[in-house]
């Protein structure tokens, strides 16, 4: 009899065990079964029909491979929405996301390519088949083919004073970004103000400038800039005079000459004379005689006391700034220029000067043409070039938001691999919430959410996590972030049943109760223990339906393998 009861008990335990195993399997695989629902119809890129998860098996940006009955189907999204990719080192984020999409997306792409691997693998195919002009921005390398200067004449001559001022302000904010070690931001802010003055003066007077010229401004030779028509010319040179004062010829003071050389006065602060001269400059043309005849003291004003601006006049803001620097305390000014030189040091490099002395393209060309821009920076040069790379990325991004575009062929992708390495890019972090109607797609790629928090702060990390439409998550060891993702997905409510028996009763007798409990749809352990070749996809608005797909490794795809390592030719030979 005892053996009979033991057999019944073991069978009961086996049934209960199998039941819970099945329930667990259903729960664990729940998120693998939602994609067919989202893709149950025949999707076409650009279709006006709305689909639940904006995913398709046809075209767009590939997030992974869906395992069908007999094949792996590439799964895309074609909306102009941004993506965050979290993948630890060695997980294959480059091989599974960046490379396959660069071999597939036909429109313009801007690619952060620290190792140069993406260029080597994809540039040739993009040039010869996808018909993209190829540029490489590698200022300290030997294969730079891109010129980038946000102050190029082609750009600046289209701008009025307010837009010129906004441009130099934005560039200044990017260069003079404060870090945690900066104990007194006063000097950094003053150095930025000095940058704005130098740059804005050049843009207003010459309609152009370069980083090298602006970086060299505090130490350049100001002697040629003191105009012979200016009263400060007589403070620089020994000038010819008569009983009636200094002699002028054609409105210009005449310097005394000895041995063919103008005779300068000793111990003259020529830089200070230039600031004073600019403080009296009325017109943008330095040769205009009205700059030197006292007109600055008799400018026409409106009823509110504002100077009435006429064509060719220099904005009074520049004169006021020049006057401020002319009156600055010598010791304080020296400290400001020291901080200025520290931030601007990178732009004094002759290699950087060559890479930033003109502009290879206009921002609108990224929409009008197909352009692939690879930003290749050696690991050892990242800290040095980070300010320049930030300026390049933010200049492109901001100018792409000046005009709306919903045409697929005008879409621009920004592949921001290891973007945290280049310092804070606050504007780019906010772009996912703004860029949809402008056709700009940002692909943020990083090794962990913890790195975003380290370089940007917890709040900024929360912003980028909440504004992207898609997340592609590889197997990770970050328990805190795995829990965060699990909480985003949410929980399901399931029924539970408990059974209790009286002492000595094995099966019969006792009581049972039914209750409910919350159960993670996707647990932190699920995330941390997915297979190496799998990814989890979260879609905004559908996070309760996470997808588990196969990673789209290019080296496992014969078609993609046939597209890599093509030769890159000079653009003029192809186009």
For each feature predicted by the language model, list its residue ranges.
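N-terminal accessory nucleic-acid engagement/regulatory domains that precede
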Residues: 1-46
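P-loop NTPase motor domains
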Residues: 15, 23, 27, 59-62, ...
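N-terminal pre-Walker A segment at the start of P-loop NTPase domains
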Residues: 38-74
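Glycine-centered flexibility motif
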Residues: 46, 64-65, 172, 206, ...
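Conserved ATP-driven motor cores of ASCE-family P-loop NTPases powering translocation/secretion/packaging/pilus
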Residues: 432-434, 438-536
């Amino acid at each position: 009899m005892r053996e009979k009861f033991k057999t019944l008990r073991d069978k009961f335990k086996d049934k209960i065990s199998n039941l819970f195993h099945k329930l667990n399997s259903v729960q664990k695989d729940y998120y693998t079964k939602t994609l067919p629902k989202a893709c149950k119809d025949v999707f076409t890129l650009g279709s006006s029909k709305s689909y639940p998860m904006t995913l398709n098996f046809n075209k767009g940006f590939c997030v992974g491979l869906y395992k069908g009955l007999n094949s792996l189907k590439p799964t895309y999204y074609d909306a102009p929405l941004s993506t965050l990719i979290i993948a630890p080192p060695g997980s294959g984020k480059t091989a599974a996301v960046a490379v396959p999409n660069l071999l597939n997306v036909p429109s313009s792409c801007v690619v952060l390519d620290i190792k140069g691997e993406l260029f080597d693998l994809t540039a040739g195919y993009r040039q010869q088949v996808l018909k993209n002009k190829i540029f490489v921005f590698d200022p300290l390398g030997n294969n730079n083919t891109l010129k980038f200067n946000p102050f190029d004449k082609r750009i600046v001559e289209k701008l009025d004073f307010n837009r010129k001022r906004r441009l130099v302000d934005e560039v200044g904010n990017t260069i003079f970004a404060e870090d945690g070690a900066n104990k007194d931001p006063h000097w950094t802010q003053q150095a930025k103000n000095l940058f704005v003055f130098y740059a804005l003066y050049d843009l207003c007077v010459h309609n152009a400038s370069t980083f090298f010229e602006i970086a060299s401004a505090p130490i350049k030779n100001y002697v040629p800039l003191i105009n012979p028509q200016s009263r400060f010319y007589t403070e620089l040179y020994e000038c010819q005079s008569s009983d009636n004062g200094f002699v002028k010829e054609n409105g210009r003071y005449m310097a005394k000459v000895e041995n063919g050389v103008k005779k300068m006065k000793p111990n003259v602060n020529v830089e200070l004379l230039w600031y004073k001269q600019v403080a009296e400059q009325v017109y943008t043309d330095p040769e205009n005689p009205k700059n030197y005849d006292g007109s600055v003291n008799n400018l026409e004003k409106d009823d509110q006391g504002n100077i009435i601006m006429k064509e060719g006049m220099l904005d009074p803001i520049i004169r006021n700034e020049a006057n401020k620097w002319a009156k600055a305390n010598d010791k304080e000014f020296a400290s400001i220029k020291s901080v200025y030189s520290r931030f601007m040091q990178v732009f004094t490099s002759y290699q950087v000067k060559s890479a930033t002395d003109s502009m290879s393209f206009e921002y609108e060309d990224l929409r009008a043409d197909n352009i692939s821009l690879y930003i290749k920076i050696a690991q050892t040069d990242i800290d040095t070039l980070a300010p320049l790379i930030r300026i390049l990325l933010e200049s492109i991004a901001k100018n792409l938001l000046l005009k709306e575009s919903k045409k697929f062929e005008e879409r621009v992708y920004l592949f921001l691999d290891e973007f945290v390495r280049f310092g804070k890019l606050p504007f780019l972090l906010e772009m996912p919430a703004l860029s949809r109607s402008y056709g700009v797609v940002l692909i943020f790629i990083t090794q962990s959410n913890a790195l975003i928090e380290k370089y940007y702060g917890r709040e900024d990390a929360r912003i980028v996590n909440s504004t992207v439409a898609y997340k592609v998550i590889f197997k990770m060891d970050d328990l805190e972030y795995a829990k965060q993702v699990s909480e985003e997905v949410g929980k399901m409510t399931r029924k539970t049943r408990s059974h209790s028996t009286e002492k000595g009763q094995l099966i019969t007798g006792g009581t049972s109760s039914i209750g409910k409990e919350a159960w993670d749809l996707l647990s932190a352990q699920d995330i941390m223990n997915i297979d190496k070749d799998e990814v989890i996809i979260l879609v905004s608005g559908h996070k309760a339906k996470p997808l588990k797909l196969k990673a789209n490794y290019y080296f496992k795809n014969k078609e993609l393998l046939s597209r890599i390592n093509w030769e890159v030719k000079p653009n003029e030979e192809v186009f």
